Amino acid sequence: MNQDIFIVDGARTPFLKSRNRPGPFSASDLATAVGKTLLARQPFAPSELDEVILGCASPSVDEANIGRVAALRMGCGYKVPGWTVMRNCASGMQSIDSAIANMRSGRGNLILAGGGDALSRAPLLYSDQMVMWFSQFAAAKTTGQKAALFLKLSPAQLLTPVIGIMRGLTDPISGLLMGQTAENLAHRFGISRAQMDSFSARSHARVIRAQDCGIFHGANEGLSPDSLSADRLSSEIEPLFDAKGTLYKDDDGVRKDSTAANLAKLRPFFDRKYGNVTAGNSSQITDGGAWVLLATEEAIKRHGLKPLARIVDSQWAGLDPAQMGLVPVHAVTPILKRHGLGLNDLDAWEINEAFAAQVLACIEAWKSVDYCKSELGLDSSMGALDEEKLNVDGGAIALGHPVGASGTRIVLNLLHVLKRTGGKRGIASICIGGGLGGAMLIENVS
């Protein structure tokens, strides 16, 4: 059943940068808060959803099957199934793709799909050696045995935890940190430190411009209770309030002083001797959540919904994990071929900015005759992507990359860009730890 699937609404939280301590919201808090606001403005009850699907890479230990947790907390009721997907950085795009598959197989007409992560709450873990010590201590039967174990205990063992997020950002096959895979691409395509820093400064500048123009908030810029109904649909971000009543209204990782010159002062992080990838030209560790509401034509007619975009096609691809950041090229290209499109036949692009080097490598790969022939099976290069159409409101280098949410965010932002500019078609694409990539072609119908 190849029926059309439409995005009829969507929203996200502000993306909140990790400040080296647990943030104010868990992943389910983020998903629930923005989901409640999104559902409250719909002409149907949350219990009329057919399904809720949430992507999450790092739920808390008390958020098992976080998709179900969020569905219940959003008021969807016991009868609406809620479940969780995990495809690392593309978890939020996988949730959309999974929803589409279910809708096209006749298993739903109205599905809420999204993603969320609170990376600031990634755990600190005991080492295997320390866990073994606890096991031995629990098995010790006499005071003497326990005392002997205490004498063997090194303060360094106790006070040097395993940093969970560093383990999560390390590929288990290649043994490389994600930033080291970006260094591989920079070396392969001859991408300089200056190019990376210039790209990163542009990301910050574009987010600042979008914030100054109220683009992310639309009619919600003043947080007025009068800015409701149709006007409110122009808002991408919905504000958050924590338990103390503190308002979180904007993405807070962007820096107005992020110029190429300032970024050039930062030291390489992943290859300290020879590298060029720094904290400044990499995505930030961030907390955030996002949803899109998907509907078939039947659901649109039944509830009087307004379709905003049609999801035309999607594609997943894989490469050597050590070349992780290049896979968007391999996910996007088959979509373009299937629809007879060139790079610049699209009106807008989103390529998630895991690393500046990684996005720039994708652009260089399409330009390379050798790469297009040997790796993509093409007769010539794809040409130069118009960077004025790419990440026009900035990207993860300035906004942050809450892993489970980013795939949904780039689809949502792409929709808003097409609406705002009157563009017809756009692609959202994302690289994925483990040597994967995903892409989604959407068409503006509003």
Feature names for model-found ranges:
Residues E183, L233, A243, V312-Q315, ...:
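Active-site pocket-lining segment
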Residues L110-N184:
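Flexible glycine-/small-residue-enriched beta->alpha junction loops
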Residues C56-I111, R121, Q157-L159, I173-L177, ...:
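Conserved catalytic cysteine-centered active-site region
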Residues M1-S26, T37, L153-G168, A260-L326, ...:
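Condensing-enzyme catalytic core mediating Claisen C-C bond formation in acyl metabolism
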Residues M86-D117, L125, A186-I215, S227-A230, ...:
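Active-site-proximal alpha-helical scaffold in enzymes
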Residues P24-T143, E221-L223, S227-A230, S235-D250, ...:
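Conserved beta-ketoacyl condensing-enzyme motif
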Residues R12-T13, P24-S28, A33, R41, ...:
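N-terminal extracellular/periplasmic Venus flytrap/periplasmic-binding protein-like
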Residues A27-P43, I66-A70, S95-S98, M178-L185, ...:
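Short, well-ordered amphipathic alpha-helical segments that serve as non-catalytic structural scaffolds
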